[in-house]
Amino acid sequence: MKVEIIKCLEDNFSYILINEANRNCCVVDPGEADPIINYLQKNKLNLKYILNTHHHNDHVGGNKELKKKFDAEVVGYIGDKNRIPQIDICLSDGEIWKKDIFEAKIYHVPGHTIGHICFHFFKNKLIFTGDTLFSMGCGRIFEGSYEQMYNSLRVLKNLDKDTKIYCGHEYTLKNSEFCLAQDSNNNELLNKIKEIKEKIKQGKTSMPSTIGEELNCNIFLKSNDLENFKKLRDLKDNF
Protein backbone atom coordinates (compact mmCIF):
# COMPACT_ATOMS: atom_id res chain seq x y z
CA MET A 1 0.00 0.00 0.00
CA LYS A 2 1.39 3.35 -1.08
CA VAL A 3 0.57 6.57 0.80
CA GLU A 4 0.45 9.92 -0.98
CA ILE A 5 0.20 13.17 0.98
CA ILE A 6 -2.19 15.75 -0.47
CA LYS A 7 -2.16 19.32 0.82
CA CYS A 8 -5.63 20.81 1.21
CA LEU A 9 -7.05 24.15 2.29
CA GLU A 10 -4.58 26.26 4.28
CA ASP A 11 -2.68 23.67 6.29
CA ASN A 12 -4.63 20.40 6.10
CA PHE A 13 -3.35 17.02 5.02
CA SER A 14 -5.44 14.48 3.15
CA TYR A 15 -3.97 11.11 2.29
CA ILE A 16 -4.51 8.81 -0.66
CA LEU A 17 -3.88 5.11 0.01
CA ILE A 18 -3.17 3.20 -3.17
CA ASN A 19 -3.30 -0.44 -4.20
CA GLU A 20 -0.71 -0.22 -6.97
CA ALA A 21 -1.77 -3.57 -8.44
CA ASN A 22 -5.31 -2.55 -9.42
CA ARG A 23 -5.15 1.27 -8.95
CA ASN A 24 -7.94 1.23 -6.38
CA CYS A 25 -7.54 3.73 -3.57
CA CYS A 26 -8.96 5.34 -0.43
CA VAL A 27 -8.74 8.94 0.68
CA VAL A 28 -8.42 9.95 4.33
CA ASP A 29 -10.04 13.23 5.47
CA PRO A 30 -10.67 15.06 2.18
CA GLY A 31 -11.00 18.65 3.38
CA GLU A 32 -11.81 19.70 -0.17
CA ALA A 33 -12.42 17.79 -3.37
CA ASP A 34 -10.39 19.53 -6.10
CA PRO A 35 -6.82 18.54 -5.05
CA ILE A 36 -8.01 14.95 -4.60
CA ILE A 37 -9.77 14.85 -7.97
CA ASN A 38 -6.72 16.32 -9.72
CA TYR A 39 -4.40 13.70 -8.23
CA LEU A 40 -6.77 10.80 -8.94
CA GLN A 41 -7.27 11.79 -12.57
CA LYS A 42 -3.60 12.53 -13.20
CA ASN A 43 -2.60 9.13 -11.82
CA LYS A 44 -5.56 7.15 -13.20
CA LEU A 45 -6.76 5.96 -9.80
CA ASN A 46 -10.13 4.50 -8.82
CA LEU A 47 -11.46 6.05 -5.61
CA LYS A 48 -13.41 3.42 -3.68
CA TYR A 49 -13.53 4.65 -0.08
CA ILE A 50 -13.51 7.94 1.83
CA LEU A 51 -12.27 7.55 5.41
CA ASN A 52 -13.15 10.28 7.92
CA THR A 53 -11.49 10.61 11.32
CA HIS A 54 -14.08 13.14 12.55
CA HIS A 55 -16.86 15.42 11.40
CA HIS A 56 -15.15 18.83 11.19
CA ASN A 57 -15.64 20.43 7.80
CA ASP A 58 -11.93 20.74 7.06
CA HIS A 59 -11.81 16.92 7.15
CA VAL A 60 -15.09 16.07 5.40
CA GLY A 61 -15.59 19.04 3.06
CA GLY A 62 -14.86 16.96 -0.03
CA ASN A 63 -17.12 14.01 0.84
CA LYS A 64 -20.19 14.97 -1.16
CA GLU A 65 -18.43 15.86 -4.40
CA LEU A 66 -16.04 12.89 -4.28
CA LYS A 67 -18.83 10.43 -3.54
CA LYS A 68 -20.93 11.81 -6.38
CA LYS A 69 -18.10 11.82 -8.91
CA PHE A 70 -16.54 8.43 -8.08
CA ASP A 71 -19.39 6.55 -6.37
CA ALA A 72 -17.09 6.00 -3.39
CA GLU A 73 -18.33 4.80 -0.01
CA VAL A 74 -17.88 7.05 3.04
CA VAL A 75 -16.54 5.38 6.17
CA GLY A 76 -16.72 6.87 9.67
CA TYR A 77 -17.55 6.39 13.33
CA ILE A 78 -21.00 5.07 14.22
CA GLY A 79 -21.38 7.76 16.88
CA ASP A 80 -20.95 10.43 14.21
CA LYS A 81 -23.34 8.94 11.67
CA ASN A 82 -25.52 12.05 11.85
CA ARG A 83 -22.58 14.46 11.48
CA ILE A 84 -20.38 12.93 8.78
CA PRO A 85 -21.77 13.89 5.36
CA GLN A 86 -22.87 11.06 3.06
CA ILE A 87 -21.73 8.29 5.46
CA ASP A 88 -22.30 4.71 4.24
CA ILE A 89 -20.25 2.48 6.55
CA CYS A 90 -20.40 3.03 10.32
CA LEU A 91 -17.60 1.58 12.43
CA SER A 92 -17.16 1.01 16.16
CA ASP A 93 -14.17 1.09 18.49
CA GLY A 94 -11.97 -1.98 18.06
CA GLU A 95 -13.61 -3.02 14.80
CA ILE A 96 -11.47 -4.16 11.85
CA TRP A 97 -12.39 -2.52 8.54
CA LYS A 98 -11.15 -4.57 5.58
CA LYS A 99 -11.67 -3.93 1.86
CA ASP A 100 -9.38 -4.81 -1.05
CA ILE A 101 -5.82 -4.69 0.40
CA PHE A 102 -6.86 -2.07 2.95
CA GLU A 103 -7.20 -3.27 6.53
CA ALA A 104 -7.41 -1.00 9.57
CA LYS A 105 -8.31 -1.28 13.23
CA ILE A 106 -10.54 1.49 14.53
CA TYR A 107 -9.60 3.36 17.68
CA HIS A 108 -12.23 5.63 19.22
CA VAL A 109 -10.17 8.52 20.60
CA PRO A 110 -12.49 11.21 22.02
CA GLY A 111 -11.12 14.55 23.13
CA HIS A 112 -10.85 16.86 20.15
CA THR A 113 -14.38 15.74 19.31
CA ILE A 114 -16.59 13.14 20.96
CA GLY A 115 -16.68 10.99 17.83
CA HIS A 116 -13.04 11.10 16.74
CA ILE A 117 -11.43 7.88 15.50
CA CYS A 118 -8.04 6.81 14.18
CA PHE A 119 -7.46 4.30 11.39
CA HIS A 120 -4.58 1.96 12.31
CA PHE A 121 -3.31 0.02 9.29
CA PHE A 122 -1.53 -2.42 11.57
CA LYS A 123 -0.09 -4.68 8.87
CA ASN A 124 1.50 -1.62 7.26
CA LYS A 125 2.51 -0.14 10.64
CA LEU A 126 0.92 3.24 10.06
CA ILE A 127 -1.91 5.20 11.62
CA PHE A 128 -4.01 8.19 10.57
CA THR A 129 -4.59 10.26 13.68
CA GLY A 130 -6.60 13.21 12.36
CA ASP A 131 -6.65 15.96 14.97
CA THR A 132 -6.01 13.77 18.02
CA LEU A 133 -2.25 13.30 17.80
CA PHE A 134 -0.10 15.76 15.88
CA SER A 135 3.62 15.63 15.40
CA MET A 136 4.87 17.24 18.62
CA GLY A 137 1.35 18.17 19.66
CA CYS A 138 -2.24 17.11 20.20
CA GLY A 139 -5.59 18.52 19.19
CA ARG A 140 -7.48 21.22 21.02
CA ILE A 141 -10.26 19.91 23.22
CA PHE A 142 -13.50 21.13 21.66
CA GLU A 143 -16.13 18.58 22.71
CA GLY A 144 -14.45 16.08 24.98
CA SER A 145 -12.66 16.40 28.31
CA TYR A 146 -9.02 16.64 29.31
CA GLU A 147 -9.28 13.14 30.71
CA GLN A 148 -10.66 11.75 27.45
CA MET A 149 -7.86 13.31 25.41
CA TYR A 150 -5.23 12.16 27.91
CA ASN A 151 -6.56 8.59 27.78
CA SER A 152 -6.80 8.67 23.98
CA LEU A 153 -3.13 9.64 23.76
CA ARG A 154 -2.25 6.86 26.19
CA VAL A 155 -3.83 4.37 23.80
CA LEU A 156 -1.80 5.69 20.87
CA LYS A 157 1.51 5.87 22.76
CA ASN A 158 1.32 2.11 23.33
CA LEU A 159 1.50 1.31 19.61
CA ASP A 160 4.77 -0.09 18.24
CA LYS A 161 7.44 2.59 18.21
CA ASP A 162 8.07 2.19 14.47
CA THR A 163 4.42 2.90 13.64
CA LYS A 164 4.26 5.81 11.20
CA ILE A 165 1.95 8.68 12.11
CA TYR A 166 0.03 10.69 9.53
CA CYS A 167 -1.88 13.55 11.17
CA GLY A 168 -4.39 16.12 9.95
CA HIS A 169 -2.43 19.38 9.82
CA GLU A 170 0.99 20.90 9.16
CA TYR A 171 1.36 22.27 12.68
CA THR A 172 4.69 20.61 13.37
CA LEU A 173 7.08 23.56 13.55
CA LYS A 174 4.68 25.62 15.66
CA ASN A 175 4.17 22.64 17.94
CA SER A 176 7.92 22.15 18.20
CA GLU A 177 8.34 25.69 19.54
CA PHE A 178 6.03 24.88 22.43
CA CYS A 179 7.75 21.55 23.12
CA LEU A 180 11.12 23.29 23.11
CA ALA A 181 9.89 25.92 25.55
CA GLN A 182 8.98 23.13 27.98
CA ASP A 183 11.89 20.79 27.25
CA SER A 184 14.80 22.95 26.11
CA ASN A 185 17.57 20.42 26.81
CA ASN A 186 16.06 17.60 24.74
CA ASN A 187 18.69 16.79 22.10
CA GLU A 188 16.36 14.44 20.23
CA LEU A 189 13.84 17.26 19.97
CA LEU A 190 16.49 19.69 18.72
CA ASN A 191 17.60 17.18 16.07
CA LYS A 192 14.02 16.54 14.95
CA ILE A 193 13.38 20.27 14.57
CA LYS A 194 16.46 20.58 12.33
CA GLU A 195 15.30 17.62 10.26
CA ILE A 196 11.79 19.04 9.81
CA LYS A 197 13.04 22.50 8.88
CA GLU A 198 15.19 20.92 6.18
CA LYS A 199 12.28 18.87 4.83
CA ILE A 200 10.05 21.93 4.62
CA LYS A 201 12.85 23.95 3.02
CA GLN A 202 12.98 21.28 0.31
CA GLY A 203 9.25 21.67 -0.32
CA LYS A 204 8.30 18.48 1.51
CA THR A 205 5.98 18.06 4.49
CA SER A 206 6.82 17.03 8.03
CA MET A 207 4.87 13.77 7.63
CA PRO A 208 5.20 11.04 8.61
CA SER A 209 6.47 10.96 12.15
CA THR A 210 6.65 7.79 14.26
CA ILE A 211 5.38 6.81 17.68
CA GLY A 212 8.98 6.43 18.83
CA GLU A 213 9.91 9.95 17.73
CA GLU A 214 6.83 11.38 19.40
CA LEU A 215 7.56 9.56 22.66
CA ASN A 216 10.94 11.29 22.67
CA CYS A 217 9.84 14.73 21.49
CA ASN A 218 6.11 15.32 22.03
CA ILE A 219 5.59 16.95 25.42
CA PHE A 220 1.99 15.71 25.53
CA LEU A 221 2.96 12.07 25.01
CA LYS A 222 5.73 12.44 27.56
CA SER A 223 3.19 13.52 30.17
CA ASN A 224 2.29 10.71 32.57
CA ASP A 225 -0.07 12.66 34.81
CA LEU A 226 -3.53 14.02 34.02
CA GLU A 227 -3.03 17.27 35.93
CA ASN A 228 0.27 17.88 34.18
CA PHE A 229 -1.38 17.17 30.83
CA LYS A 230 -4.19 19.61 31.62
CA LYS A 231 -1.67 22.30 32.52
CA LEU A 232 0.27 21.74 29.28
CA ARG A 233 -2.89 21.80 27.15
CA ASP A 234 -3.98 25.10 28.73
CA LEU A 235 -0.53 26.59 28.19
CA LYS A 236 -0.53 25.50 24.55
CA ASP A 237 -3.97 27.02 23.96
CA ASN A 238 -2.49 30.41 24.83
CA PHE A 239 1.01 29.92 23.38
Descriptions of predicted regions:
Residues 1-43, 119-130:
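Conserved beta-strand hairpin/beta-sheet module of binuclear metal-dependent hydrolase folds
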Residues 16, 96-122, 126-127, 158:
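Core dinuclear metal-dependent hydrolase active-site scaffold
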Residues 17, 29, 54, 66, ...:
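Divalent metal-coordination and catalytic microenvironments
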Residues 25, 32-105, 195-199:
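Active-site HxH/HxHxD metal-binding segment of metal-dependent hydrolases
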Residues 30-32, 55, 79-80, 112-113, ...:
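Active-site metal-binding loops of divalent metal-dependent hydrolases
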Residues 50-60, 109-115, 166-172:
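Histidine-centered catalytic micro-motifs
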Residues 137-162:
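Active-site-adjacent loop/tail segments of enzyme domains
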Residues 154-164, 173-239:
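Accessory terminal helices/loops
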